[in-house]
Amino acid sequence: REAVSPMRKSGFFPRLALVNLMRNGRFYGPYLLSCGMTAAMYYILSYLTFSDIVASVRGAGYLQSLMYLGRLVVTLFSAVLLLYANSFVMKRRRRELGLYNILGLEKRHTARLMVWETLYCAAAAIVGGLAAGVLLSKLVLLLLLQLSPLPVEYGFEISLSGMADTAALFGFLFLLTLVWNLFGLLRSRPVELLHSAS
């Protein structure tokens, strides 16, 4: 009976991607933490932008304009941060990626691995960022209401529009990093990767 290659087994690449992320935790830990923090900031600004309570505060138009400007600033900051941090992490994994080729993985296999790694990173950063944003958004709203004579409401509110906007933005940014990584993989040569600094 013909032996089945491990790479053809179901779940091989998802498991290997998870192992890689854990093994490179010293790089991916700060990377995911920074991504999650910016996702939380974006959600909080979106939450305040769409909040009916903020809309009823004196000077609401001015406040909402500030929130829109804040979302734009966080968007630009997040794009720069993700691309720079991703480049930093991938430079330190170049030798590892070159070794995969020596061990028999073709570039298409490494590309599949990168896809799974990006999916895991995106899920962790978006879910973690939204969770932190939801928890902190009420606190930020309470601080804002100190500037208003309106009574403080202690209920818990979640902005579905804010969650959707946050997930869409950071999903797109992680997609950009994946495309960039795949482009770099296609242009690279295994020998160059192996002689790169780890």
Give the predicted meaning of each segment.
Residues 99-100, 113, 153:
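Short alpha-helical segment immediately N-terminal to, or the first helix within
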Residues 39-50, 84-88, 120-150, 161-187:
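Small-residue-rich transmembrane alpha-helices
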Residues 59-76, 148-176:
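Conserved transmembrane alpha-helices of multi-pass membrane proteins
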Residues 1-29, 92-96, 106, 141-162, ...:
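Feature of multi-pass inner-membrane transport and sensor proteins
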